Design a protein with these regions (language model features):
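Positively charged, small/polar-rich N-terminal and surface patches that mediate targeting and assembly
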Residues: 416-422, 435-587
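Glycine- and aromatic-enriched membrane alpha-helices
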Residues: 2-462
Length: 587
């Protein structure tokens, strides 16, 4: 008996530690949301996105301490709400610290989902207000129904880790906010009757940053779904289903977009990974590999459909796909419990023992019992979120205003809301990006001065341009991969100086069709090399012929050669002008 007690104690302590580690992983997901939202939006708003994700958690912590936690896990009042209280201040010695931290990080996740759908045009103050309301009232009350012993929990509604009470609620808040807020300037083109006739794509400025965010979220999701597990078998099963669903969703999305758009869509596949994670969250403990596989397939298709629906039918601007990922797949994940719950999953017996589920899913012989409960929970929680967030957003719009001004949106919220010239100042040229340099009058070089130490002494020579030595500038736009061949060809004919620049551009053909999140872009800017050469000795036609010889493939995009007359040239170091300025030093 003593051995069994020791074993149980060790198990309890181990899973208690894992519970807090899981909470830390969920907190780390805030970084993932920040990276996804930043990468999928434009650079001029990157700092604003980061600031909003930071304040989600910080404001959420304050209001959750004061209001939210007791409403969520306080003494149940009629199955609807927890009894308000301040035990964290008045009874700290007996306070459930672990439960508070765990529920806090879940609460912050709900609020941060809204940020992406309303990105690039929301006033920062307004964002802080509605984020606080979500964390203080909207999330804690509906989460009490499910996790705090409320009426849905008493009925046997099952949402193990939050497909419904976190992701669906966050997604519903996002779509309501985005609808009331309106689209970004230029997203939808309307005719004189106000009908949308065209949808424009606004590509995010950093797909790698978005991908980093997805991997951070996926990693954190093992804590998100697994932290509440109390046996090693249950934990292992949750990890397995949490891996299968997003992987299958991503492959499904890749195949579908490959067929539909002729190329696999990177950003859509990143969204599909998150969609699979959202969809499996409610049933991760009570479904098996087969169920997770099917849930993932539907999630991968649903996210593509959701993005298309918002863009082309509802005309709601969602820059990061938050609605398709969280709302639609939150609904799907909630319903999926009633379809795929099985007693073969280790967590099913635990859920049944705790009254957290009533029956197996429809496809496993349980009939419509659990499916009916899941539908009831989805409808009531959705209705709560719709009513609350509609009131909140309309109230904000009528008072302090919800949307940034047109000028602020065009300039970018970084500079207008935060005084931040650029979130990437180190990569910019100009005042914002260059290091400070101390300049004294001793460093100034005067023309004609005999005391100049900075310049190499040289005789100033001037000459008339020979009649047969006209100065010409040749500019070549070409494919990057042909540059080394061009450089060798120019060297072979005696051209020894050139200026090379990496550029983006396209010709009249606008490049091949390109899609971003299912929307065809106006034109595709392709990476090119721009080579500039100023020549006098070498005949222009020799340069043109040599360039054409190495650049020609017979396909669109071989490049173009531009020829300009040059009026004069001045060599800064020596003061030489004209033809002489282009010549090297005499031996």
């Amino acid at each position: 008996m003593a051995v069994e007690q020791i074993t149980n104690l060790i198990s309890e302590q181990t899973f208690g530690i894992w519970f807090l580690i899981g909470a830390a992983l969920v907190f780390w997901m805030q970084a993932g949301f920040a990276m996804v939202e930043t990468g999928f939006t434009r650079a001029k708003n990157a700092g604003n996105i980061i600031m909003k994700n930071l304040m989600d958690f910080c404001i959420g912590t304050v209001v959750f301490i004061v209001i939210g936690f007791s409403l969520l896990l306080g003494e149940d009042l009629a199955g609807f709400i927890g009894k308000p209280g301040f035990d964290i201040f008045t009874a700290y010695e007996s306070f459930d610290f672990s439960s508070f931290v765990f529920n806090l990080v879940f609460c912050a996740t709900t609020a941060t989902i809204v940020s992406g759908a309303m990105a690039e045009r929301t006033k920062f103050l307004s964002y802080c207000v509605y984020s606080g309301v979500i964390s203080a009232l909207v999330y804690p009350i509906e989460a009490h129904w499910i996790w705090g012993g409320g009426w849905l929990a008493q009925l046997g509604f099952h949402d193990f880790a939050g497909s419904c009470c976190i992701h669906m609620v966050g997604g519903i808040s996002a779509i309501i906010g985005a609808k009331i807020l309106g689209p970004r300037i230029g997203k939808f083109v309307k005719d004189e009757k106000g009908k949308v006739v065209k949808v424009n794509a606004f590509p995010g400025h950093s797909i790698p940053l978005g991908a980093l965010g997805v991997f951070i979220l996926w990693f954190g999701w093992y804590g998100f779904n697994g932290a509440a597990c109390t046996t090693i078998e249950d934990l292992g099963s949750v990890f397995l289903t949490t891996t299968i669903a997003p992987a299958v969703a991503t492959v499904t999305c890749m195949i579908f977009t490959w067929i539909k758009y002729k190329k696999p869509d990177v950003s859509m596949c990143l969204n599909a990974s998150l969609a699979g994670l959202v969809a499996i969250t409610a049933s991760c403990d009570v479904t098996d590999a087969k169920g997770a596989f099917v849930i993932g397939i539907v999630a991968g298709l649903l996210v593509v459909f959701g993005v298309w629906l918002l863009d082309y039918k509802l005309h709601i601007d969602d820059p990061v796909g938050a609605v398709a990922v969280h709302m639609m797949n939150g609904i799907w994940g909630t319903i999926a419990v009633g379809l795929f719950a099985t007693s073969k999953a280790p967590g099913y017996a635990i859920a049944m023992e705790n009254g957290a589920i009533k029956a197996e899913g429809l496809f496993f012989g349980g009939g419509f019992t659990q499916l009916g409960l899941q539908l009831l929970g989805f409808v009531t929680v959705a209705a709560w979120a719709v009513v609350c967030m509609t009131i909140v957003f309309l109230a904000i719009k009528a008072t302090i205003g919800l949307r940034a001004s047109k000028e602020e949106e065009i300039k970018g919220l970084d500079i207008c809301e935060h005084g931040l010239t650029s979130a990437y100042a180190g990569f910019e040229f100009g005042a914002a990006g260059m290091p400070d340099i101390d300049i004294t009058y001793d460093d100034v070089v005067s023309v004609g001065s005999e005391s100049v130490e900075n310049a190499v002494p040289a005789m100033v020579k001037t000459s008339e341009i020979p009649d047969d030595k006209k100065i010409t500038k040749v500019e070549i736009l070409m494919k990057q991969e042909r540059f080394e061949a061009l450089k060798k060809a120019m060297n072979d004919i005696g051209v020894t100086g050139m200026t090379v620049t990496q550029v983006l551009g396209c010709g009249a053909q606008k490049g091949a069709p390109e899609y971003y999140r299912g929307v065809q872009m106006e034109m595709q800017l392709l990476p090119k090399v721009q080579v500039e050469m100023v020549i006098s000795k070498v005949p222009v036609m020799d340069v043109i012929n040599a360039a054409r010889k190495v650049l020609y493939t017979g396909h669109i995009g071989d490049g173009k050669i531009f020829v300009y007359d040059v009026e004069n040239v001045v060599k800064v170091r020596t003061g030489e002008v004209g033809y002489d300025a282009l010549q090297g030093e005499d031996d």
